[in-house]
Amino acid sequence: MIMSTHNIYLLDTCICVALLKKSPSVIQRLREVGTHNCKISDITLAELYFGAFKSGKEKHFNDVSEISKLFEKYPIRHIRKYGEIRWELEKQGLRIGDMDMFIAATALEEDLVLVTGNVKHFERIPGLKVENWMERK
């Protein structure tokens, strides 16, 4: 019997922004894997809301609402994994933002593929599966 591998994808904030800007490569890949196989973190939603408040544009608040409806959300719950990631990076003299470490912790603990345009940033985290949908294939 052949077992099929079925990835579930966690979309980083930059991918959601690219989707809202109608990035052809992100839209194409989303169609290939299906929106039902893509999730976001509450952290991503928080970052999108920050951008909406920063811009002050009603359209951006509407965009966040659409993203929120489109994708299932993972709550912030992998606090211990965040601490481990932060400690491991600090021991190596490396640093990424706290929000990104929470997103990475979710991807690791839930066995998700993290989709980001910032692969170099996240590849510092051992064991994290990362894809860049912003690159054209």
What do the predicted segments below correspond to?
Residues 15, 21:
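Short, glycine/acidic-enriched loop or turn micro-motifs at the edges of active sites
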Residues 2-11, 24-109, 113, 129-137:
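PIN-domain endoribonuclease scaffold, especially VapC-family toxins
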Residues 115-117:
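Catalytic beta-strand/loop signature of glycosyltransferases that borders the donor
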Residues 119-121:
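C-terminal structural segments of small proteins and small subunits
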